[in-house]
Amino acid sequence: MPGTVRPGEPVQVAIIGGGIVGVVLAVGLIRQNVKVRLFEQSQGFREIGAGIAFTANAIRCMEQIDPAIVTALRSSGSVPTSTGDEKDPNDYLRWIDGYNLHREDDPYYQRMLYKINAGYRGFEGCRRDQFLEALVKVIPPEVVECKKRLESIEERGLEEKLILTFVDGTTVEVDAVIGCDGIKSRVREIILGEGNPASYPHYTHKVAYRTLIPMEDAIKALGEYKAKNQHNHVGPNAHLIHYPVANKKMINATAFVSDPNEWPNDRQMVAPGCREDMEKAFAGWSPCVRNVVNLFPKELDKWAVFDLWDYPAPFYNKGKICLAGDAAHASSPHHGAGACIGIEDALCLATLMKQVNVSVQASRVSKGKALSAAFETFNAIRRTRSQWLVNSSRRVCDFYHQPEWADPAKWVKAETCFEELKDRSYKIWHFDYDEMIKETLKSYSNREAALLQESSEGSVEK
């Protein structure tokens, strides 16, 4: 009958959202012979032209999902964000004093506060839009449908197909839904409930201004070494981070400023901004920082930084519906790892969907039960780590914005944060994804065994 899941049929999954995590997941599921349909609400793929960086670990996860993803990343102009020099090919994260002038005779001089070795190609940076453009080419065009804003999901029973209704009135039937629709996720609102504070993001009281700057201009502003390597300039109530992108032809620069006020509209996270406001926030900072600020456009967007920390999602799954990436655990960007954690999600889900296919094709368990067990497994494996990131990203921004940076008598106190920052960074960089895969397979297998036992006992009773 129409709408009923037939045993042995290939699993059909709808991915809601065409951001980086949604597209990476689509590539991974296609590789595992899962029938995928990807629905994006905008007319095209929505990433802006700002920079993004991936850890070496996240890139290895991409390789596990499908090597074509790494090929797309490299073809989009990704470069190591922070190699020191020819003698030392490793990447480093650097925190420098962005506020105080330490040498009157050399305005370019800034005191190095801390440096962490991220290893060879520890971070690779690129433009978001260029990576996504290269990534989309990996997916068959018939998989993607744009201008599809999700309105509702109708659940009619575990062994019945889900009915997706879009704002344009069209409907689609699928076996499962994975919401990768970002921080303002409609899928999250559906499974957690309208009006539930956990369904919506909340303001972190930080705003961001970002731009791309030609490398030659960046060198004039910062000096060659700082321009060609990642640096994070910290100071009271603000910080500025930059790193090279586009084959080192540009730098991606983002300024974050603390804001004690409430954001006026939590449905609209972007507002018109101006360089004059940035200049006020960074008045009195080091000449290098002010030089970079002067290279931002006079008129530009001001991005409110929202996240899901105040009211974390209590679960990522409901039946045959699941959340991944920012839809599940949108964090502030201060670890630079939100997308990396989303890539880990995609690897976990691709692993699970492969097992679901095996279970269904072998007729061990029904498709509905297999999918539900898979999403329960995903929730168990991924929620704790991903929620930790949301918390930790808030924590490290507090380090960067300490008022103590402005008081020389309290510099030693302020600098005690860096050992903790190193530990937090290592937790992200040195994640054992092989162990995650093993735990995922074991957890799913245990759930499947419990379902088989339950089915066997039910047959005996009959």
Curated annotation (Swiss-Prot):
Enzyme Commission designation: 1.-.-.-
Active site: 210, 243
Induction: Deletion of the conserved eukaryotic csnE deneddylase subunit of the COP9 signalosome leading to defect in protein degradation results in the activation of the silenced dba gene cluster. Expression is positively regulated by the dba cluster specific transcription factor dbaA. Expression is also controlled by the transcription factor flbB.
Listed Gene3D superfamilies: FAD/NAD(P)-binding domain (3.50.50.60)
Superkingdom assignment: Eukaryota
Protein name: FAD-dependent monooxygenase dbaH
GO molecular function: FAD binding; monooxygenase activity
